[in-house]
Curated annotation (Swiss-Prot):
Belongs to the DPM2 family. InterPro entries: DPM2. This is Dolichol phosphate-mannose biosynthesis regulatory protein. The chain crosses the membrane at residues 8-28, 50-70. Pathway: Protein modification; protein glycosylation. One of its GO terms (molecular function) is enzyme regulator activity. One of its GO terms (biological process) is dolichol phosphate mannose biosynthetic process. The keyword Endoplasmic reticulum applies.
Length: 79
């Protein structure tokens, strides 16, 4: 494993920690903060807290299903 692989992995972990912290703050903490507070300007409307993960879930499941379907079709052609 080269140094570039470790660096890319480290950057991905840092990005994931940032996304987790941002999403957790957005969904769990901001509903208890007054809506005209300055911190609210850094977050999308709360509806997107549900819409974005649902869209990602649907896209992910579709990609996995498509991949599995293509693998099954390809394996039948080889027989």
């Amino acid at each position: 494993m080269g140094a570039s692989d470790k660096f890319i992995g480290f950057v991905m972990v840092l990005f994931r920690i940032f996304v987790f912290g941002y999403y957790t703050t957005w969904v769990i903490i901001t509903p208890f903060i007054v809506s005209d507070h300055w911190i609210q300007q850094y977050f999308l409307p709360r509806e997107y807290g549900i819409i974005i993960p649902l869209v990602l879930l649907v896209v992910g499941i579709t990609a996995i299903g498509t991949f599995l379907g293509l693998v099954m079709i390809k394996s039948k052609k080889n027989k």
